[in-house]
Amino acid sequence: MTTPANTTQAVGSTTSTTTTTAGATPANSGLFTIPDGDFFSTAKVVVASNAVATNEDLTKIQKIWKDMKIPSDTMAQAAWDLVRHCADVGSSAQTEMIGTGPYSNGVSRARLAAAIKEVCKLRQFCRKYAPVVWNWMLTNNSPPANWQAQGFKPEHKFAAFDFFDGVTNPAAITPKEGLIRPPFEAEMNAAQTATFVKITKARAQSNDFASLDAAVTRGRITGTTAAEAVISLPPP
């Protein structure tokens, strides 16, 4: 067993003790390396997020779409059209896509979405292009179609889509000019609130009873705790 070596040195009235361990790993070696300022200013970073489709995902989807005869020169526009459509109707796995976009060579949005789901979640794909759709909507003053149905105020209507959090995600694809404007804090709060309400309502539809005895369920098929939580939210 290796024992520490102690060195004691007296300087005037001050005594200092240095303890070293034989065979210790040097401080600047392998995983023990201590970074300096040059590293932080020159290091290369590849931003990735598990909430957003990866570049590898896009490569796979692109191959599938190419096999579906989506023209290469309008493939990006077909993706943007699909994601803009999802801003209107939603991007959950259960959402039914409507119609056919103008850039997909007659291939329906439903088929495009089905191909995406073979590789990643539709919402992950939508987040990848959220900044593109954000600029598109602002440029045309065209908010998501269902903003009123979702209970958004007029001043927050451009945040009324379920992949809004992708707008500021650094792993998303951002237009060359950048965002026309970043989302306002009030829009972020409205989007987060809408997400919370949707999740809570969805949980309220599930049966969380530990027993099917009528004394427990009182004849109800679903639980109500979550729904009641939404109704009785405390004031801000």
Swiss-Prot record:
Taxonomic lineage per UniProt?
A: Viruses, Riboviria, Orthornavirae, Kitrinoviricota, Alsuviricetes
UniProt protein name: Coat protein
Keywords in alphabetical order? Capsid protein, Helical capsid protein, Ribonucleoprotein, Virion
- Compartments (UniProt record): Virion
One term of GO molecular function: structural molecule activity
Annotated spans, Disordered: 1-27
- The species is Potato virus X (strain HB) (PVX)
Q: Which GO cellular component does the record give, naming just one?
A: helical viral capsid
Query: Locations of Low complexity compositional bias?
Result: 7-27
